[in-house]
Amino acid sequence: MNMPFPSREQVESIRKNYPPDTRIVLNNMNDPYSPVESGTRGTLRYVDDCGQLGVAWDNGRSLSLIPGEDSFRKLTQQEIIQEQGMKVGEMVL
């Protein structure tokens, strides 16, 4: 489906809601050729002028999200704390 090009105001709103380093989890990606698996987490790197979110996925992939096409959400503060705890635990072992 072709999405209309977002206005400058819409892009700025996306940038405000998704600043760099925001942690994201993918619910579903509408890409039949090379989708990222549902449940994959990643870190937002940028929002481009088309309003697409450039994400560095934890599985090593780099594929943008398209708001309105792909389903995703920010990680909750509790999920972020749990991730940080796992990383600390991994370093101790």
Model-inferred region functions:
Residues 84-93:
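Non-Sec secretion/translocation targeting segments of pathogen effectors
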Residues 2-85:
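Basic/aromatic-rich interaction segments and small domains that mediate binding to polyanionic partners
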